[in-house]
């Protein structure tokens, strides 16, 4: 059973109840303090490598043998389940395999309904005559990319991409963006960049979408102009400048792209069905489909994010009927928490509404109907959280594990990628590794209709992968280099950063000191960081605390720790080391019980604990405003640059002590492997010198 990650459901409720360690995890000074705490203290405390395919003939023999031995699959009746009420423990094994909020069982979600061949004509599926005027020219991206690519050119590009031979170009764009584009190196002189897209008029959309697209997206603005050309040209895209303000426009644009792709794929298959039936030509060869029906996959962090995507889709695809729409809304949507009015905008967007991170749903498009909760093998589009999808792919019963429904996905859209990092990135990696593998069973496939690049196990070189993230990390960069193989090109767009240090929400200047430590490799970073902290920074901190006459006034040190593993290491050191015997401290993380968090925050504010250890994931899920902070030590810089301003802003929560706190300031550790984080914090112009500077390893900004 896949590990849920973080012990969190949605934004982090229901943390794991763990047995306490064999040592003291916190230490309290016995000093006089007021019983009646400021209400503000507790106001928010309740809150596998790519598998190589078999040769074509062996694949046909294997799948045909399985099909013949089993005989025709029978129809199976869906099993209905009552909706479940109440909160369930995230680690409860039953939750992983049970039905949540009216979803089908795992077996039912994967069960096929015969006939289920991708090309089978279902009543009302598509009206071929209605779209007879939608025939596209050969240079239209859908045609040149999927339907009728130049086989010789495609083969050359696949060979170059498989050998990791890419030619690239980079440029600064209007709006403060940097672009890096790569294409397979087949002897071209240069790597062209596409012009910004001012409107959707140049996009070849299906006629049934055109009027809604024209009405609802009259023009494109901001960074959407720069990203859209590559998305509609079916290139791989890593966009690292996602913002809350442009998220709706980006979501609508992607919804048009995904829906348009589904409709074009289905209409082409069904028109060819009619052609085969009419001509009765045994030599007619029509390669127009994949092994299985699903063509688009969305990976999203929460159910409410799924609702927003579906709302965007139905703005443009407006069928006469939407089957099970009410059931979908009841199970996936919820109202925002009114107590979050003072939370940051990005927090409200991510966690507003239904923040459950365990879901999956299939959508099927027909001419007059959009069907919700369709079984995966009869779905055109799948929306899921990484946890929800992995649960069905990686079941405890090996015989029930299945990922064939991902074998023919042609467009993958991952939104809120940075939020998925805070859940469990291993789930995302697992899913990406299982995309476009050749299926283990036939699933009713007509192999005479399957496109040759599917049969040759080259689908990953044609598939489009789109990632939207507020910032880029090494893990996200790894997806760009490991899973983005699109032979028509791949692009990375990143902002040019001014630096979070210049945008602090404080009335007075704050001393911000950055200390670089040497490290030979990324794997040795944790040990080098720990050694530098305990020998240099902690010794000074302990001396200041233990030699002060007033322990309460000497306290107020917040230690911010991005990694949970580093947090455990530091917490254990504070609890057991002779160096910190006389230092009172508290430690709170994403796994800490709410009551313990409240106690630690109150002890820290009143001076009973001089030091508070605080993790990045806890801040991500709760966005606490910690009072009593007089100085900040960043054991590592946050991935999210917004967090820098919020954490440093703790220094100004007590107006009477803001000047003293500003003098205490911030001290942050970094190594050369923190380059991406450092760029977001200090700015693109400063980061190079700080990483290469030979004259010193300490840098101070006011």
UniProtKB/Swiss-Prot annotation:
InterPro entries: P-loop_NTPase, UTP25, UTP25_C, UTP25_NTPase-like. The keyword Phosphoprotein does not apply. It is found in: Nucleus, Nucleolus. Residues 1-157 are annotated as: Disordered. Keywords: Nucleus, Ribonucleoprotein, Ribosome biogenesis, rRNA processing. One of its GO terms (biological process) is maturation of SSU-rRNA from tricistronic rRNA transcript (SSU-rRNA, 5.8S rRNA, LSU-rRNA). One of its GO terms (molecular function) is rRNA binding. Residues 10-20, 72-81 have a biased composition (Basic residues). The keyword Cell inner membrane does not apply. One of its GO terms (cellular component) is small-subunit processome. Residues 31-49, 88-107, 114-138 have a biased composition (Acidic residues). Belongs to the UTP25 family. Component of the ribosomal small subunit (SSU) processome composed of at least 40 protein subunits and snoRNA U3. DEAD-box RNA helicase-like protein required for pre-18S rRNA processing, specifically at sites A0, A1, and A2. PANTHER family: ORF PROTEIN-RELATED, U3 SMALL NUCLEOLAR RNA-ASSOCIATED PROTEIN 25 HOMOLOG. This is U3 small nucleolar RNA-associated protein 25. It comes from Emericella nidulans (strain FGSC A4 / ATCC 38163 / CBS 112.46 / NRRL 194 / M139) (Aspergillus nidulans). The gene is utp25.
């Amino acid at each position: 059973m896949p590990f849920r990650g973080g012990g969190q459901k949605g934004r982090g409720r229901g943390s794991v109840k763990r047995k306490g360690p064999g040592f003291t995890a916190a230490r309290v000074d016995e000093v006089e303090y007021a019983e009646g705490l400021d209400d503000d203290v507790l106001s928010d405390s309740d809150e596998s490598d790519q598998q190589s395919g078999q040769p074509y003939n062996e694949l046909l023999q294997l799948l045909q043998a399985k099909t013949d031995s089993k005989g025709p699959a029978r129809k199976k009746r869906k099993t209905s389940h009552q909706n479940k009420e109440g909160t369930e423990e995230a680690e409860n094994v039953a939750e992983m395999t049970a039905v949540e909020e009216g979803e089908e069982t795992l077996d039912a979600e994967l069960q096929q309904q015969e006939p289920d061949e991708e090309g089978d004509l279902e009543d009302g599926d598509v009206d071929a005559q209605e779209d007879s005027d939608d025939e596209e020219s050969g240079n239209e991206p859908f045609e040149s990319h999927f339907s009728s690519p130049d086989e010789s050119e495609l083969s050359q590009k696949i060979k170059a991409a498989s050998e990791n031979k890419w030619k690239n170009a980079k440029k600064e764009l209007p709006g403060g963006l940097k672009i890096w584009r790569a294409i397979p190196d087949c002897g071209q002189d240069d790597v062209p960049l596409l012009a910004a897209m001012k409107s959707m008029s140049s996009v070849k959309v299906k006629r049934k979408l055109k009027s809604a697209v024209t009405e609802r997206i009259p023009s494109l603005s901001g960074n959407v102009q720069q990203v859209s050309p590559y998305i509609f040209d079916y290139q791989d895209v890593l966009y690292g400048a996602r913002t809350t303000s442009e998220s709706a426009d980006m979501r609508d644009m992607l919804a048009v792209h995904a829906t348009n792709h589904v409709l074009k794929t289905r209409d082409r298959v069904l028109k060819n069905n009619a052609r085969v039936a009419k001509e009765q030509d045994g030599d007619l060869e029509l390669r127009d489909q994949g092994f299985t029906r699903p063509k688009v996959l969305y990976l999203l962090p929460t159910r409410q994010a799924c609702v927003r995507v579906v709302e965007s889709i139905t703005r443009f695809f407006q069928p006469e009927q939407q089957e099970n729409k009410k059931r979908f809304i009841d199970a996936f949507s919820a109202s925002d928490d009114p107590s979050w009015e003072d939370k940051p905008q990005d927090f409200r967007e991510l966690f507003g509404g239904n923040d459950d991170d365990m879901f999956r749903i299939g959508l099927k498009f027909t001419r007059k109907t959009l069907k919700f909760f369709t079984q995966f093998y009869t779905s055109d589009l799948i929306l899921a959280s990484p946890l929800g999808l992995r649960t069905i792919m990686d079941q405890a019963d090996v015989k029930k594990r299945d990922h064939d429904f991902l074998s023919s996905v042609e467009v993958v859209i991952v939104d809120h990628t940075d939020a998925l990092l805070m859940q469990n990135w291993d789930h995302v990696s697992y899913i990406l590794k299982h995309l476009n593998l050749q299926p283990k069973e036939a699933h009713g496939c007509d192999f005479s209709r399957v496109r040759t690049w599917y049969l040759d196990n080259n689908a990953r070189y044609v598939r489009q992968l789109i990632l939207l993230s507020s910032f880029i990390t090494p893990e996200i960069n790894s997806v760009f280099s490991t899973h983005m193989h699109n032979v028509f090109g791949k692009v990375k767009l990143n902002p040019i950063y001014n630096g979070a240090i210049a945008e602090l929400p404080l009335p007075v200047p704050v001393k911000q000191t950055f200390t670089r430590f040497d490290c030979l490799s990324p794997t040795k970073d944790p040990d080098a960081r720990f050694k530098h902290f305990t020998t240099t920074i902690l010794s000074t901190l302990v001396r200041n605390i233990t030699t002060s006459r007033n322990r309460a006034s000497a306290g107020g040190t917040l230690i911010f720790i991005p990694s949970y593993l580093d947090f455990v290491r530091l917490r254990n050191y504070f609890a057991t080391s002779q160096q910190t015997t006389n230092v009172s401290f508290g430690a709170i993380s994403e796994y800490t019980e709410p009551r313990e968090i409240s106690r630690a925050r109150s002890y820290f504010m009143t001076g009973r604990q001089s030091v508070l250890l605080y993790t990045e994931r806890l801040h991500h899920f709760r966005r606490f405003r910690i009072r009593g902070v007089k100085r900040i030590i960043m054991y590592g810089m946050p991935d999210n640059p917004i967090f820098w301003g919020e954490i440093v802003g703790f220094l100004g929560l007590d107006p009477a002590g803001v000047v003293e706190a500003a003098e205490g300031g911030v001290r942050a550790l970094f190594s050369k492997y923190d380059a991406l984080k450092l760029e977001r914090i200090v700015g693109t112009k400063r980061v190079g010198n700080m990483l290469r500077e030979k004259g010193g390893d300490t840098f101070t900004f006011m």
